[in-house]
C-alpha cells in the first residue's frame, strides 16, 4: 500500500488542492477541515462517542472490537461504496483521519482488499493543521501593503485583481461590516485558517512573491478572526488609501448590497422567500448597529428602509435606499473609518482614486 509524507509534502497537498477523503466523524470535520476535504466518515458521531467511552472504560482492544461491530454488514457496505466511488472520482486523492492512526489505516486496508491502493496522510489532520499554521507564520513575515478606504471604495475588488492579493473577506465569507454576511455560512475558525494558509501557499507558489496586498481589516471578519501572526504584521504594514468620489461609492454599494444581494437571495430561495430573506438581511444589518446609532436615529433609518423596500418591490428601483444609506455613511461609517485611519496616519504611504491606487500597487 502506498504512503506519502515529509513536511514539504503537507504543503504540496494544500497547494495542489489534493482531494482529501476525511474519515473522521462529522463533529470533528465541522470543527476544522482542510479546504479540499470531503467528509466520508468511518464512524458517525454516535458510533465514535460509543467507541470513545468503551476505550476509556475497557481499553483499546474492546474499543476496536466495538468499532468493527458497529460498522459491519450493510452499514460497512454503504460506507465502502462511498469510499470506493470517491477514490475512483479522485485518483490523485489521499485518506485522512485525526492523526493518521487506526481509522485511516482501517479504511485503507478495506479498500486495498477491494482492489484499490490508496495513500493516507501520515500524521493525519493534525499534521496538516500544523503545516498550515506554520506556513501562515512564515509567509506572514513577507512585507504587506494594506488597501484602505471608506465603505464602497472597491477595496476588495482591487485586492482581488492583484496577483499577490489575498481576499480575506472572500475566504471568511463575510464582508466585515454589519451588512457583511453572505449566503454562504462562515467556516469554523480552524477551517478558515486552513483555507487562508492554502491560499497564501498557492499565491506564493505562483510567483516570486515580494509582498502581500491585503485589505485593511479589523481583527474580526464576521465570526472569524485573523491569525495573530498575520494580524500583528498587518498593524505594522504600509497603507494605501482609496479616496473615490461619494457618488461612485454609492454606485458600488447599490450594486453590491441591493442589486446583487437581492439577486442572490431570490436565486437561492425563489422570488417570495428570497424577498423576505433579503428584507430580513438588510434589517438585521441595521439592527446590529442600533445601539451606536441611538434609538431615535435607528427608528428613522429603519422606517426609511421599509419605504425603500416597498418602492423596490413595486418598481424594481433601488434608488429609495439612498434615503437611509447616505446618512448612514455620512453619520456612522465614514466618521468611524476616518477615526480609525487617523490612529495609524503615519502608516499611510499613498492616497488616490481607485485606478491610481491600483496603478501604485503594481509598482511596489
Curated annotation (Swiss-Prot):
Where are the catalytic residues?
Answer: 97
Give the molecular function GO annotations.
Answer: transferase activity, transferring alkyl or aryl (other than methyl) groups; tRNA 2-selenouridine synthase activity
What catalytic reaction does the record list?
A: 5-methylaminomethyl-2-thiouridine(34) in tRNA + selenophosphate + (2E)-geranyl diphosphate + H2O + H(+) = 5-methylaminomethyl-2-selenouridine(34) in tRNA + (2E)-thiogeraniol + phosphate + diphosphate; 5-methylaminomethyl-2-thiouridine(34) in tRNA + (2E)-geranyl diphosphate = 5-methylaminomethyl-S-(2E)-geranyl-thiouridine(34) in tRNA + diphosphate; 5-methylaminomethyl-S-(2E)-geranyl-thiouridine(34) in tRNA + selenophosphate + H(+) = 5-methylaminomethyl-2-(Se-phospho)selenouridine(34) in tRNA + (2E)-thiogeraniol; 5-methylaminomethyl-2-(Se-phospho)selenouridine(34) in tRNA + H2O = 5-methylaminomethyl-2-selenouridine(34) in tRNA + phosphate
Question: What's the Enzyme Commission number for this chain?
Answer: 2.9.1.3
- Sequence ranges assigned to domain Rhodanese in this UniProt record: 14-137
**According to the lineage, what is the superkingdom?**
Bacteria
Assembly behavior:
Monomer.
List the protein's name: tRNA 2-selenouridine synthase
Source organism per UniProt? Shigella sonnei (strain Ss046)
Q: What is the lineage of its organism?
A: Bacteria, Pseudomonadati, Pseudomonadota, Gammaproteobacteria, Enterobacterales
Amino acid at each position: 500500500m502506498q504512503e506519502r509524507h515529509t513536511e514539504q509534502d503537507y504543503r504540496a497537498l494544500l497547494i495542489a488542492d489534493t482531494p482529501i477523503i476525511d474519515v473522521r466523524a462529522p463533529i470533528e470535520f465541522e470543527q476544522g477541515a482542510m479546504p479540499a476535504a470531503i467528509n466520508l466518515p468511518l464512524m458517525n458521531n454516535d458510533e465514535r462517542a460509543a467507541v470513545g467511552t468503551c476505550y476509556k472504560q475497557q481499553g483499546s482492544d474492546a474499543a476496536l472490537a466495538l468499532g468493527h461491530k458497529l460498522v459491519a454488514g450493510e452499514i460497512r457496505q454503504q460506507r465502502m461504496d462511498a469510499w470506493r466511488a470517491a477514490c475512483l472520482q479522485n485518483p490523485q486523492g489521499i485518506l485522512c483521519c485525526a492523526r493518521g492512526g487506526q481509522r485511516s489505516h482501517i479504511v485503507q486496508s478495506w479498500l486495498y482488499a477491494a482492489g484499490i491502493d490508496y495513500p493516507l496522510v501520515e500524521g493525519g489532520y493534525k499534521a496538516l493543521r500544523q503545516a498550515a499554521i506554520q506556513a501562515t507564520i512564515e509567509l506572514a513575515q513577507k512585507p504587506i501593503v494594506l488597501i484602505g478606504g471608506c465603505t464602497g471604495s472597491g477595496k476588495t475588488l482591487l485586492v482581488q485583481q492583484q496577483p499577490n492579493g489575498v481576499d480575506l473577506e472572500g475566504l471568511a465569507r463575510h464582508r466585515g461590516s454589519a451588512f457583511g454576511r453572505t449566503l454562504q455560512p462562515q467556516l469554523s475558525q480552524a477551517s478558515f485558517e486552513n483555507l487562508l494558509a492554502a491560499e497564501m501557499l498557492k499565491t506564493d507558489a505562483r510567483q516570486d512573491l515580494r509582498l502581500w496586498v491585503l485589505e485593511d481589516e479589523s481583527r474580526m471578519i464576521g465570526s472569524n478572526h485573523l491569525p495573530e501572526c498575520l494580524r500583528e504584521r498587518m498593524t505594522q504594514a504600509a497603507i494605501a488609501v482609496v479616496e473615490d468620489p461619494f457618488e461612485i461609492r454609492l454606485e458600488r454599494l447599490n450594486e453590491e448590497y441591493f442589486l446583487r444581494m437581492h439577486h442572490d437571495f431570490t436565486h437561492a430561495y425563489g422570488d417570495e422567500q428570497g424577498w423576505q430573506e433579503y428584507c430580513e438581511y438588510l434589517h438585521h444589518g441595521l439592527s446590529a448597529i442600533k445601539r451606536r446609532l441611538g434609538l431615535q436615529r435607528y427608528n428613522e433609518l429603519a422606517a426609511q428602509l421599509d419605504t425603500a423596500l416597498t418602492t423596490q418591490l413595486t418598481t424594481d428601483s433601488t434608488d429609495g435606499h439612498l434615503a437611509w444609506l447616505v446618512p448612514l455613511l455620512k453619520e456612522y461609517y465614514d466618521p468611524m473609518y476616518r477615526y480609525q485611519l487617523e490612529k495609524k496616519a503615519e502608516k499611510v504611504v499613498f492616497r488616490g482614486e481607485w485606478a491610481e491606487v491600483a496603478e501604485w500597487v503594481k509598482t511596489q
